[in-house]
Structure formats: C-alpha cells, structure tokens
C-alpha cells in the first residue's frame, strides 16, 4: 500500500464484523502513546476488536496487549471489529493510522 490509501476495507467478514488492514506509517511504530490513542478511541463504544500482527492476535482495547505485538514501521495490522459501533470505530482507527498518530 502506498500514498494516502493505507486502508483496505472488507465489509462484512462475518455477521456484523468489519475487517481492515492498516499500514503503520509512523517511524517509531506502535509504542505507548499510539497504543493509548487507540484504546481511547474505544471509550464509550459498544464493540469488540482485535489486532493481528505477524500472526499474533490481541485485544485491541488493551494498551498492554497492543504493545506486546511489537508492531513496527511499515508493518501491517489487521483489525477486526464487531458490534453496533464497529463502523464508527473503524473510521476513527483509519484516521489515526493514516495520520501516523500525529508523528509524521
């Protein structure tokens, strides 16, 4: 993926589940600040979400779980979200991933 189109959206994967692949654009990868930004996006949202990176899948609503992925620059994270808020949260995630978490 290149340019401004760093999101591949497949809708739906299963009943009500969304899936997307995001490229990590910020040079420092997913460290504490971006992980915290991601988790805050889920505040008040009714959905379940997972991130998969290099074959490892974790709860996307947990800073520690996200950090354990060790996701680095130019890596791709597969996101799966299910629930009433899935579409809204996926859009928010697209915005922060595509902005490089404000580190570009």
From Swiss-Prot:
Protein name per UniProt: Phosphocarrier protein HPr
Higher taxonomy: Bacteria, Pseudomonadati, Chlamydiota, Chlamydiia, Chlamydiales
InterPro entries reported for this sequence: HPr (IPR050399), HPr-like (IPR000032), HPr-like_sf (IPR035895), PTS_HPr_Ser_P_site (IPR002114)
Top-level taxon of origin: Bacteria
Keywords for this protein: Cytoplasm, Phosphotransferase system, Sugar transport, Transport
Domain HPr: 17-104
Biological role: General (non sugar-specific) component of the phosphoenolpyruvate-dependent sugar phosphotransferase system (sugar PTS). This major carbohydrate active-transport system catalyzes the phosphorylation of incoming sugar substrates concomitantly with their translocation across the cell membrane. The phosphoryl group from phosphoenolpyruvate (PEP) is transferred to the phosphoryl carrier protein HPr by enzyme I. Phospho-HPr then transfers it to the PTS EIIA domain.
Localisation: Cytoplasm
GO CC field: cytoplasm
Keyword Cytoplasm: yes
A Pfam family the protein falls into: PTS-HPr
Signal peptide: none
UniProt similarity note: Belongs to the HPr family.
Matching CDD domains: PTS-HPr_like
Protein source organism: Chlamydia muridarum (strain MoPn / Nigg)
Entries under Gene3D superfamilies matching the protein: HPr-like
Active site (record annotation): 31
Keyword Aminoacyl-tRNA synthetase assigned: no
């Amino acid at each position: 993926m290149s340019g401004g189109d760093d999101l591949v959206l497949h809708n739906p994967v299963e009943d009500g589940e969304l899936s997307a692949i995001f490229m990590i654009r910020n040079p420092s990868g997913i460290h504490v600040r971006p992980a915290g930004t991601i988790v805050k996006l889920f505040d008040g949202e009714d959905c379940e979400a997972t991130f998969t990176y290099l074959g490892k899948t974790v709860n996307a609503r947990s800073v520690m779980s996200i950090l354990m992925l060790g996701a680095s620059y130019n890596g791709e994270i597969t996101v799966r979200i299910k629930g009433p808020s899935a579409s809204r949260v996926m859009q928010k995630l697209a915005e922060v991933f595509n902005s490089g978490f404000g580190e570009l």
